[in-house]
């Protein structure tokens, strides 16, 4: 389906951005290298080679310092990125010579023949595109400090940075794919709307958040409460309501008939496995309600069934009846 793992990741990123209706211009680093978009910036890095090395080398172990080079040539035979020491350079032509196990390799740094080590690459992208704001995980804070220095060395101000905390599981431990603790963004979007996830992310952006299954129903109910509350608020208070920000100033108007937690109980007690059956039970309490008139509730019926099937039903334990109960 994809030509490379990188292309797969790019498509996943675009899919995520589209789900949340981000306006974006996608730029492939590989294509930018090959098309020469980075050429001027690469020549600038070569021009400032000694200054860049003075920033990076003190952060490396002694053994690594002997072989480190910010430029990584692409092997003409295999197409693989080579991490080998630099012997010579020509700052005017952009040609550099590397030592590949005793063999000298001459390479141009232009048009995709070389890539940069990532901390230098990060700064080079900021320099190229005049990036003025960059978000990154807390674990990249030290790298961002180095890239800021390199960007200044190249001749431009680095972007304003925003370091965010990483997600934790219900025990307060880091989420790990190998452990399978916590839930993924994809799972959240199976159990609840993108807007509920936006609401979850909205408060305290610099604080570590616990991300596990039980958080979803609670957040959905908070979202429903905020949507309903918005309609009766004065304008100055509406702006303080998180759904104003989640919906870019235009939150939906829908009366909340039942919270998500109640809907989950209804799924469990009715044993409904599709939203049509669930709506029949809803109509027992609210006869005149129709799915088309309550789009939020209608979407919640599907989310509730998915959540119940995945997170509640597998953990249900039934008591064995006693002889009297039989």
Language-model-detected regions and their locations in the chain:
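Catalytic adenosine-cofactor/nucleotide-binding cores of aminoacyl-tRNA synthetases and other
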Residues: 139, 165-313, 317
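Short, intrinsically disordered, charge-balanced linker/junction segments flanking boundaries
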Residues: 317-326
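Internal, well-ordered alpha/beta segment that forms a basic, Gly-enriched binding/recognition surface
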Residues: 1-16, 22-29, 189
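Hydrophobic alpha-helix feature that most strongly marks membrane-spanning transmembrane helices
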Residues: 1, 152-155, 201-202
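A structural signal for well-ordered alpha-helical segments within the folded catalytic domains
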Residues: 7, 11, 36, 141, ...
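Active-site cores that bind ATP or allylic diphosphates and position pyrophosphate for catalysis
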Residues: 18, 22-185
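Alpha-helix capping and helix-coil boundary motifs
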Residues: 4, 50, 60-63, 118, ...
């Amino acid at each position: 389906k994809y030509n490379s793992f990188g292309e797969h990741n790019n498509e996943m990123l675009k899919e995520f951005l589209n789900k949340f209706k981000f306006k974006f211009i996608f730029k492939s680093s590989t294509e930018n290298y090959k098309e020469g978009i980075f050429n001027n910036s690469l020549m600038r890095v070569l021009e400032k080679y000694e200054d860049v090395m003075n920033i990076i080398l003190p952060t490396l172990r002694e053994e690594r310092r002997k072989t480190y080079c910010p430029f990584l040539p692409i092997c003409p035979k295999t197409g693989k990125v080579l991490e080998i020491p630099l012997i010579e350079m020509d700052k005017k032509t952009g040609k550099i010579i590397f030592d590949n196990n005793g063999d000298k390799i001459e390479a141009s740094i232009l048009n995709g023949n070389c890539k940069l080590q990532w901390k230098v690459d990060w700064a080079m992208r900021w320099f190229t595109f005049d990036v003025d704001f960059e978000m990154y995980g807390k674990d990249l804070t030290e790298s961002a400090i180095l890239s800021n220095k390199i960007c200044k060395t190249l001749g431009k101000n680095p972007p304003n940075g925003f370091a965010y905390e990483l997600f934790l599981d219900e025990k307060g431990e880091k989420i790990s794919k190998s452990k399978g603790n916590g839930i993924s963004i994809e799972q959240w979007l199976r159990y609840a709307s993108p807007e509920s996830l936006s609401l979850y992310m909205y408060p305290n952006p610099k604080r570590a958040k616990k991300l596990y299954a039980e958080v979803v129903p609670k957040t959905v109910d908070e979202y429903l409460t905020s949507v309903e509350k918005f309609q009766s608020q004065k304008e100055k208070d509406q702006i303080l309501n998180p759904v104003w920000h989640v919906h870019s100033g235009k939150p939906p108007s829908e009366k909340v008939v039942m919270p998500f937690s109640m809907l989950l109980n209804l799924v469990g007690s009715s044993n409904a496995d599709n939203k049509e059956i669930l709506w029949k039970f809803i109509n027992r309490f609210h006869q005149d309600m129709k799915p088309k008139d309550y789009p939020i509730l209608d979407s919640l019926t599907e989310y509730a069934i998915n959540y119940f099937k995945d997170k509640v039903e597998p953990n249900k334990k039934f008591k064995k009846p006693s002889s009297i109960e039989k």
